[in-house]
Amino acid sequence: MSKPETTAAPNFLRQIVQADLDAGKHAKIVTRFPPEPNGYLHIGHAKSICLNFGLAQEFAGDCHLRFDDTNPAKEDQEYIDAIEADIKWLGFQWSGEVCYASNYFDQLHAWAIELIKAGKAFVCDLGPEEMREYRGTLTEPGRNSPYRDRSVEENLDLFARMKAGEFPDGARSLRAKIDMGSPNMNLRDPILYRIRHAHHHQTGDKWCIYPSYDFTHGQSDAIEGITHSICTLEFEDHRPLYEWFLANLPVPAQPRQYEFSRLNLNYTVTSKRKLKQLVDEGHVSGWDDPRMSTLSGYRRRGYTPESIRNFCEMIGVNRASGVVDIGMLEFSIRDHLDATAPRAMCVLKPLKVVITNYPEGQVENLELPRHPKEDMGVRVLPFGRELFIDAGDFEEVPPAGYKRLIPGGEVRLRGSYVIRADEAIKDADGNIVELRCSYDPDTLGKNPEGRKVKGVIHWVPAEGSVECEVRLYDRLFRSANPEKAEEGGSFLDNINADSLQVLTGCRAEPSLGQANPEDRFQFEREGYFVADLKDSRPGKPVFNRTVTLRDSWGQG
């Protein structure tokens, strides 16, 4: 794709924060990032992380990490650990200790009792289906629950018995008493507490009733002194409820909620439920599979924190919903790796070359720059009689415009000599297994006199090169809108069957043999690659393709 504008895109929240500070509303701004620990963070979360932590950094404020752990059945310590690691990897550090909504369960319970005593909450016996019927629709008002007019005393008694574990899951709930005729569905007597007999990763078995997200969120913000509670647009309709709770409870502060548009990328699924389905059903190797849209997946793919932060800055922050072209994210990593990744050569499909006129036993150590622009020093390649080129760089019957090696033709080996193909050796099945070539000793670093050699190909020495595994990753979905499936189908029907190709027996230049996990390179003519975080180790490298050198999808 064409190069996007790299200047910072508009951010209306930056302007709001600046105006609030200028007006003296807050001595210091405090933001928060409140993930639910029921899955790994994905690329959409990166936008929220960069926004909340970025605003706190820019305006010398604080940003809290708070786990919204109100649904113990779906939460796990594994997710908590992964979320903390992802935030740190992105380059951010939360202020103070990690917070948990469960830290405030006692206070939330006390406030629920205050609402009951004020006649603003009641215990309801309606089940989920009945409650849905009573709730009404967007065009029809709801109906009051038959239990709405219970006395304060009865509600206090029932709520205490709910807490004591007397009733089974789903038998009763505590609801706010607001307005069943409100055009805003969130104000139609929303649930404050549900019965869930589930072990909690932080509080153990202390509780069998758990507060709803809506009852927890604003009060947690108030307890922590959050000044700017920033959510995605789907929570805009929840703001009146957020404000109702703050107005009807003796909270220590009055935070303000703001909304921005969430990140939607084409060719990408970010639903935690669907990401979990991909993992559970074995369509990918795990939450950190390099094809996943999780931050741990992007990290293992070879994306850098800088590239993701830059991408989030490029797309900006606004309230307009839309779909961002994944090409912008791919541009961001290409741009960063082009400037920072050392160059190296790796032959993915090796074809042996014997240079018949090169002296046997002789080896020259050729110095090649590690980067064409930056001063990264040099790497040394031993050049001898035998080497490997890519099988795709020789054609007996070349197509039009082919500029690589052909019978009797010449090419330059990158950083080395010009060679000519003299003979192709084949096996019994007619497959080319070796090339016999000759070299021009006067062409090291210069063109031969009277001949113009157009093609340049990469190579590695036969002796000293390192055998490696290379994993060619591509987009997991072949459809720009993978959520859109044929009638009766699912998003799984849009999985790209060619999203992973594993190549073994590849040959890398000697300098790559000691690559450490997460070392990144540009393999010349092949793309940008990273030594795999889990499977690669010095002496037995495994490289993942991060991104191609150019946007090949845009040419289709």
From Swiss-Prot:
Class of this enzyme: ligase
- Determine if Aminoacyl-tRNA synthetase is one of this entry's keywords: yes
| Name of a matching Pfam family | tRNA-synt_1c_C2
Q: Which UniProt keywords apply?
A: Aminoacyl-tRNA synthetase, ATP-binding, Cytoplasm, Ligase, Nucleotide-binding, Protein biosynthesis
Q: Name one GO biological process term.
A: glutaminyl-tRNA aminoacylation
UniProt key word RNA-binding:
no
Write out the annotated subcellular location: Cytoplasm
Q: Transmembrane residues, as ranges?
A: none
Q: Which reaction(s) are listed as its catalytic activity?
A: tRNA(Gln) + L-glutamine + ATP = L-glutaminyl-tRNA(Gln) + AMP + diphosphate
Q: Name one GO molecular function term.
A: ATP binding
In this chain, ATP is annotated as bound at: 36-38, 42-48, 232, 262-263
Record motif 'KMSKS' region, residues:
269-273
- Motif 'HIGH' region extends across 35-45
Identify the EC number(s).
6.1.1.18
Chief location category: cytoplasm
CDD domains referenced in this protein's UniProt entry, alphabetically? GlnRS_core
GO CC aspect terms: cytosol
Residues at which L-glutamine binds:
68, 213
Relate the assembly described in the record: Monomer.
The UniProt entry's sequence similarity note says: Belongs to the class-I aminoacyl-tRNA synthetase family.
Put simply, this protein is called Glutamine--tRNA ligase
Q: Say which species the protein is native to.
A: Pseudomonas aeruginosa (strain LESB58)
